[in-house]
């Protein structure tokens, strides 16, 4: 399934994987998964984290390695219930729930994920998605960007 991904997608997923793989050992543990999810405002139980890992842990060693992560991402991209996932993701970014993602909100989430971005980089991300030029990202613009990935 992962063989249907482009080189660009694989390199983006490698970057995402390294955000989760806090100690850089090539495996995502339940602890690391929990850290990232909590930084995004989620509060999964230990059992839920274990279930998430087990879902993709092909070799049964209790962690997710990069090939397993790629398969998960490839499956997720095929998912038909992505509409709900997109709404959920938008809500994570839209801290004040006003229907828009501001530069400050984008910076906040990216910082929580361990991505230190300059103001220019954040502004560039906003500009790329900001079709109507109002300086923030509405849901339609967010969906366009996410679907283009």
From Swiss-Prot:
Domain EF-hand: 8-43, 44-79, 81-116, 117-149
Binding-site list for Ca(2+) 3: 94, 96, 98, 105
Chain positions with N-acetylalanine modification: 2
Annotated protein name in UniProt: Calmodulin
Residues where Ca(2+) 2 binds: 57, 59, 61, 63, 68
Molecular function (Gene Ontology), one example: calcium ion binding
N6,N6,N6-trimethyllysine: residues bearing it: 116
SUPFAM superfamilies: EF-hand (SSF47473)
GO cellular component: myosin II complex
Record InterPro entries: CALM/Myosin/TropC-like, EF-hand-dom_pair, EF_Hand_1_Ca_BS, EF_hand_dom
Lineage of the organism: Eukaryota, Viridiplantae, Streptophyta, Embryophyta, Tracheophyta
CDD domains listed in its UniProt record: EFh
Function: Calmodulin mediates the control of a large number of enzymes, ion channels and other proteins by Ca(2+). Among the enzymes to be stimulated by the calmodulin-Ca(2+) complex are a number of protein kinases and phosphatases.
Keyword Repeat applies: yes
Matches recorded under PANTHER family: CALMODULIN, MYOSIN LIGHT CHAIN 1, 3
